[in-house]
Amino acid sequence: MPTIFSLFLIISCNRKEKQSTFLFEHGGIEREYILYVPDNIQPKAPLIFVLHGLGSTSSYIREYSQMDEVAKKYGFVVCYPQGTESGQNSIHTKKGSSFWNVGYDIHINEYVNDVSFLKSLARYLQEKYNLDPRKTFCSGMSNGGDMSYLLGCEAADVFKAIASVTGCMMAWIYESCVNNAIPVLQIHGTKDDITHYNGDMKNKDKWGAYLGVETTIDFWIDQNKCLGSMIDTIGFTHKSDSSYIISKKYINGINKNEIWFYKVINGGHDWVQKPVIKDFNTSEEIWRFFENFISLNNLDT
């Protein structure tokens, strides 16, 4: 049984919403997470996890994503879990850098089971705060996006849809993920110099082989048996900015599942927000994607 310890409660002078950091004991390890619960949250509200990138923190992705503001506006709970610290130096990271265990080559000697941890934490929060298990989702950036894909394959019983921002699908996850239909959102820049848009199946960067973005999307389209598609373009912010987004939505899949893909032309390794792209906010789009799942399945009644 997981044990919960309250570390500290941060409440700003002009806001009533609960903003807390806790410890959650799992597998003999005390794991940290930040929880944002808007004031007057309704029973059976949605729960969204937001996972940080490699070497980052839960507090950083919270500030960077500004998901609290979206949660306050639309009425859902946000959990920002903290990854564990690596036990040794590597060609990419220093000892002690935080990570989600998706099987990178640099983590070959790391054995933490983050799938089990995140599933257990989600179930605890569902019960503790009376949140709807049918409306529990996961999103993440970079390594957190990679982890979201792993959850999509191994934890779809808990996380009903996933969103990956600048993340990838490791080759080993792709090879082991069979007959699993789950809604997926991917947001990725074509000039991402960290998680390459075209992947790295030859493992030149020594992370471990991973698929290109479009191959990954094709995989999930096939998994969900989507029968239709829609394409749109989200325009420039200003004339000197060459970035824009091609939006592709694949619809009418198994259980009404949809695959949304935002291809950020000339985009980098970013959680895209205004003013980079006019009228586009990644956190808002993630919620819109999850809300679409809720609506299609009549879960908001």
Listing of model-derived features with the role each one plays in the protein:
Residues 106-129:
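Alpha/beta-hydrolase active-site loop
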Residues 192-195, 269-271:
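Acidic catalytic loop of the alpha/beta-hydrolase fold
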Residues 10-47, 59-74, 110-116, 133-165, ...:
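A domain-start/cap signature at the N-terminus of enzymes
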Residues 53-57, 267:
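Active-site glycine-rich loops that stabilize anionic/oxyanionic intermediates
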Residues 75-79:
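A fold-wide structural signal in alpha/beta-hydrolase
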Residues 83-113:
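Cap/lid segment of the alpha/beta-hydrolase catalytic domain
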Residues 50-53, 80, 263:
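Structural cue for short, hydrophobic secondary-structure segments
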Residues 186-188:
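Short beta-strand/loop motif that positions the catalytic acidic residue
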